């Protein structure tokens, strides 16, 4: 799902993302796949085979992957909390989704100086989420490969369902028009280019060690160049498609609130839960 929507210039950003994809994303994706495929090792020992002092590069990749795993598992815990709440009637977030997310689920404090208590149900959901991860990885690639059949296909089912639902909402057309609006002036701004490259690195999981690990399980005869181009392109196309239902939802919310899309006061991960 696209992470940035502020300013409603995604079509312009698509051009920047494509440039970033083919100049840095695909080459680095292919390089990491080949590194694991050639040495048959994970990131730590794979980089060490290049030079004995490069072990620190592999260690840094594993460390970053651990941090990312903690972050995503927290988001999964929030999703489990919402799943449990979805059985209530009426839905607890129907009236004020923003307050429900920040006050009801996160129980967030006004500032770091005023720490709130532990949200025990979120903690429990986090434990359950980690148990799911442990179960998926319990037998290595034998179990994770089977789980991937579900985790790799279900997002596309959800995207189609959300696209249909978003298209039927009032204000969806305005949201899609904002999504496809072009602002060529943004092409001259360094900040938008930096964000585009950041998005490509983040969405492809480059430099996190995962691609090296995946490559280590691939037969040496498999075409790594084909996969190094095809997978990133599909990833980018999926993100662009997902943007349609995101902006359809934003168009609906902006119409309900009577404000412009760019004036909505939420972004980032909260967007998925508030919309």
Can you annotate each of these PLM segments?
Residues 1, 145-275:
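Membrane-embedded translocation segments of transport machinery
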Residues 1-21, 49, 146, 165:
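Signal-peptide-cleavage-adjacent N-terminal segments of secreted and extracellular proteins
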Residues 4-5, 38-60, 75-135, 141, ...:
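Inter-helical loop and helix-membrane interface segments of multi-pass membrane transporters/permeases
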Residues 12-17, 56, 222-231:
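Membrane-interface alpha-helices at helix entry/exit sites of multi-pass transporters
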Residues 16-52, 73, 169:
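Juxtamembrane transmembrane-helix boundary signature
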Residues 18, 22-26, 127-131, 156-160, ...:
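Generic alpha-helical transmembrane segments of integral inner-membrane proteins
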Residues 18-23, 60-71, 124-132, 194-205:
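Hydrophobic alpha-helical transmembrane segments of multi-pass membrane proteins
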Residues 52-85, 137, 153-164, 227-246:
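Early transmembrane alpha-helices of polytopic membrane proteins
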């Amino acid at each position: 799902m696209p992470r940035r929507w502020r300013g409603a210039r995604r079509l312009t950003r698509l051009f920047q993302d494509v440039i970033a994809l083919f100049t840095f994303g695909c080459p680095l994706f292919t390089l990491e796949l080949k590194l694991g495929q050639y040495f048959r090792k994970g990131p730590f020992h794979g980089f060490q085979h290049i030079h004995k002092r490069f072990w620190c590069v592999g260690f840094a990749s594993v460390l970053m992957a651990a941090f990312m795993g903690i972050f995503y598992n927290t988001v999964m815990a929030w999703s489990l909390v919402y799943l449990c709440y979805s059985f209530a009637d009426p839905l607890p977030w129907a009236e004020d989704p923003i307050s429900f997310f920040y006050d009801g689920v996160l129980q967030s404090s006004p500032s770091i100086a005023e720490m709130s208590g532990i949200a025990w149900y979120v903690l429990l959901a986090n434990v359950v989420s980690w148990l799911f991860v442990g179960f998926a990885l319990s037998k290595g690639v034998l179990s994770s490969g089977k789980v991937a059949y579900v985790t790799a296909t279900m997002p596309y089912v959800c995207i189609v369902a959300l696209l249909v639902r978003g298209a039927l909402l009032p204000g969806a057309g305005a949201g899609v028009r904002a999504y496809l609006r072009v602002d060529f002036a943004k092409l001259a701004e360094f900040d938008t280019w930096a964000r585009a490259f950041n998005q490509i690195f983040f969405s492809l999981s480059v430099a996190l060690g995962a691609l090296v690990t995946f490559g280590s399980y691939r037969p040496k005869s498999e075409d790594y160049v084909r996969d190094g181009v095809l997978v990133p392109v599909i990833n980018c196309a999926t993100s662009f498609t997902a943007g349609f239902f995101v902006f359809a939802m934003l168009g609906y919310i902006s119409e309900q609130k009577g404000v412009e899309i760019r004036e909505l006061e939420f972004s980032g991960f909260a967007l998925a839960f508030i919309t």
